[in-house]
Amino acid sequence: MKERSDKSVDKAAVDRRSFLSVALSTCAIAPLATLSLQLATSLAGSLTKEQRDSMTPSQVIDELKKGNERFRAGKMAPRDYLAEKRSSAAGQYPAAVVLGCVDSRVPAEIIFDTGIGDTFIGRVAGNVVNDDMLGSMEFACAASGAKVVLVLGHTACGAVKGAIDDVVLGNLTGLLARIKPAIPATKFEGEKSSKNAAYVDAVAHTNVVLALAEIRRRSPVLEELEKKGTIQIAGAMYYLTTGVVEFLG
């Protein structure tokens, strides 16, 4: 009986050593595995500088994709907005800057399931690029360290419809003029009118593509950061009926 007891003790010691070995290995790996998950903040607060800086542009985009998957599945991360407010009050370290449309159905923070302090958001009808938006993107990336510039278009865009219909209305006229280059640049077979949803969406897609080119052309600051691999300039389309965000290219 004593011999059996000794063997049990020895086995227990081995089991403890094995457990500690595995645990230590897991602890060493865990930071690398979890840092890229911080856009899905739970109840701890906003992104820290260390967490944001540890991520590559590709990892940031992957997290935006995962956030959209959670949104579509109705399994969004639990959040304590008061904790996020407190943790971000002394400083912000967003991982991405999103240029989206003013459309009330396309709230980027929600469709990507990000919290307070996780993303810079700029919104204007038709997600058009102008000097103010470019300056905001440069601030987000060059001054604040964001890793991704994302232009987010969407289906059934009213601004795109207005550009197709050549709407003239106060200051809106000048804004729509920024979208109009996407109309002749869109290759489409079928009825080319604002009543054709497929055509409107095709023009909206082209509008995003042209916006990406315009950002690179008009902002040497962002273009240089992208060439260095510091940031990634990307485009995406949000589908109102499904909630899917489809990244371009």
Where are the model-predicted features located?
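N-terminal secretory signal peptides
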Residues: 1-14, 28
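Twin-arginine (Tat) signal peptide motif
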Residues: 11-20, 34
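Divalent-metal-activated hydrolytic enzyme cores
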Residues: 20-27, 31-32, 46-91, 117, ...
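Signal peptide processing junction and immediate N-terminal pro/mature segment
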Residues: 35-45
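Active-site alpha/beta core segments
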Residues: 90-97, 103-109
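Short beta-strand segments
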Residues: 99-101, 123, 150-154, 234-239
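Active-site cofactor/substrate anionic-group-binding motifs, chiefly glycine-
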Residues: 102-127, 132
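Gly/Ser/Thr-rich loops at beta-strand to alpha-helix junctions
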Residues: 104-105, 154-159
